[in-house]
């Protein structure tokens, strides 16, 4: 038996009935992808999740190492506290970059998840018109994978930030492969 995902409108309505802010409820309903349990869990942690999301996004678009260190420290504490919340955070970052990819290609906000950040999405897509948003998403997903496999978190995060910043400039970047070290 297959149960399809619940519509965003129904989830948003349920979250609003439980006392959630309409804009925040819409964002959490869209992030959850039709999963009722996840939407409620995200709503309970929404302020904390959004604060950490903005910190991580700020690090991705900043060249200030103090912001990077604050982000790395936050992610490291989150990993030791609850790895599931860390993975939710990375999923949210991927969704934000997906919104940037979608908006820069389609120039419409119909399918944007982070509607509450539409001005920022518009501004970033104009500032980084040459950005390779898809490569940014790959960098984030790879970093999440490496950290989940016990990669050294500070190194992985710094590499991700630097790789994203190269992709934002539209620089062609080829990821390092292990075979690059082996003699031919």
Question: What do the PLM-derived regions correspond to, one by one?
Answer:
Residues 94-98, 102:
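Amphipathic alpha-helical core segments of compact helical bundles
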């Amino acid at each position: 038996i297959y149960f399809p995902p619940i519509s965003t409108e129904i989830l948003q309505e349920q979250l609003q009935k439980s006392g959630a802010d309409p804009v925040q409820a819409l964002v959490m309903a869209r992030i959850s992808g039709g999963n009722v349990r996840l939407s409620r869990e995200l709503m309970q942690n929404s302020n904390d999740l959004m604060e950490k999301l903005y910190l991580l996004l700020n690090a991705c678009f900043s060249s200030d190492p103090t912001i990077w260190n604050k982000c790395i420290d936050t992610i490291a504490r989150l990993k030791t506290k609850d790895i599931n919340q860390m993975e939710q955070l990375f999923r949210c970052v991927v969704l934000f970059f997906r919104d940037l990819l979608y908006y820069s290609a389609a120039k419409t906000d119909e399918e944007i998840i982070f509607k509450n950040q539409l001005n920022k999405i518009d501004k970033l897509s104009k500032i980084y018109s040459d950005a390779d948003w898809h490569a940014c998403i790959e960098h984030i997903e790879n970093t999440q994978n490496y950290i989940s496999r016990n990669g050294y978190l500070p190194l992985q995060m710094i590499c991700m930030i630097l790789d994203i910043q190269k992709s934002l400039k539209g620089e062609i970047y080829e990821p390092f492969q292990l075979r690059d070290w082996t003699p031919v």
